[in-house]
């Protein structure tokens, strides 16, 4: 097969085995993480090691952001957005240099808030190492990723955590560093394994009737699965109470679908979920998550590759280049406003 975008004939590219490691990342308070999905991955992929990446000293990133935002919101200030950005700039310039010398982020957060008389909620309780051992996870420190050639990425990581409180972007940095340095498969903590194969009777009915599965329909199938394994805690009532109108069905069709789902799930066990098995990628490339119905659309909630992949290295290099561009244009600490073609430079708080 020839890949036109890359100009590569993939049939001639060597395929390499991916290390048997599943990587999960959590940034923030570990008390808030829901491990239900990770547990499912672990139980259905017993040949894989579970690496749980966690920044032990950054559990107060949410506390810092919320404290500053609440502090500004009660002040009689005309431009609250600008005031919030200014305090966050001070926070970064106070916290980050000290982190570089070995101080704890969490301790510096409390120190900064106290020094500036910014009220904050009680910090969450500390997590013991037993938390990881009891779940069979191998504890890995995010900070170890910022060594040698990757020390600049530590600065970018804290830009996202302190200045923008953009945990998703911080996680993007971390997941790429993990895959490049370790290889294996990165998975978002809110991503399930492929489960559609367990719906034998339902899927046969869908094909027969020519039903197009909407996002609501797919979500309904997932909710039913989660209810079956008693992991539905916290799901919104609107999802659990889904009706035929949301699925684009009439009442009769909806009842039939519920009946078939019940039949499919009657004898369900986790053994029915297909394991990843041995995973291969083309040399120096990577595999990404995708949905069958979205041709050419890929997602970074699932990334798999071997160590030192050139493709991942290129992505990291481009990321570094863009952060440096923003630094040169003074767009890290300033609120850049431009309604023209360069509006992507605008800092988002």
Segments and roles (model prediction):
Residues 1-172, 187-349:
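Glycosyltransferase-associated regions of secretory-pathway enzymes
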Residues 172-184:
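Small-residue hinge/turn detector
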């Amino acid at each position: 097969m020839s890949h036109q975008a890359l100009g590569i004939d993939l049939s001639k590219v060597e395929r390499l085995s991916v290390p048997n490691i599943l990587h999960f990342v959590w940034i923030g308070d570990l008390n808030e993480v829901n491990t239900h999905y990770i547990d499912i991955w672990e139980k259905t992929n017993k040949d894989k090691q579970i690496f749980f990446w966690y920044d032990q000293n950054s559990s107060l990133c949410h506390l810092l952001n919320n404290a500053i935002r609440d502090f500004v919101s009660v002040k009689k200030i005309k431009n609250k957005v600008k005031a919030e950005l200014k305090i966050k700039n001070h926070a970064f310039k106070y916290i980050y240099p000290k982190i570089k010398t070995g101080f704890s982020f969490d301790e510096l957060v409390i120190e900064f808030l106290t020094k500036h008389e910014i009220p904050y909620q009680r910090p969450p309780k500390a997590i013991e190492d037993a938390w990881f051992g009891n779940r069979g996870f191998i504890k890995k420190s995010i900070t170890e990723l910022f060594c040698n050639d990757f020390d600049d990425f530590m600065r970018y990581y804290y830009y996202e955590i302190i200045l923008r409180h953009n945990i998703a972007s911080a996680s993007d940095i971390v997941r790429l560093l993990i895959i490049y340095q370790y290889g294996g498969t990165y998975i978002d903590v809110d991503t399930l394994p492929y489960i559609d194969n367990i719906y034998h009777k339902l899927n046969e009915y869908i094909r027969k009737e020519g039903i197009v599965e909407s996002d609501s329909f797919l979500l309904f199938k997932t909710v039913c699965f989660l209810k079956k394994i008693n992991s539905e805690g916290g799901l919104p009532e609107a999802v659990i109470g889904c009706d035929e109108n949301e699925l684009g069905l009439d009442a009769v069709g909806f009842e039939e679908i519920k009946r078939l789902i019940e039949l499919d799930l009657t004898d369900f066990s986790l053994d029915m979920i297909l394991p990843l098995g041995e995973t291969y990628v083309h040399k120096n490339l990577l595999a990404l998550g995708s949905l069958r119905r979205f041709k050419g659309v890929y997602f970074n909630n699932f990334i798999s590759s071997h160590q030192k992949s050139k493709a991942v290295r290129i992505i990291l290099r481009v990321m570094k280049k863009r952060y440096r561009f923003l630094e040169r244009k003074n767009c890290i600490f300033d609120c850049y406003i431009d309604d023209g073609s360069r509006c992507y430079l605008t800092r988002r708080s």
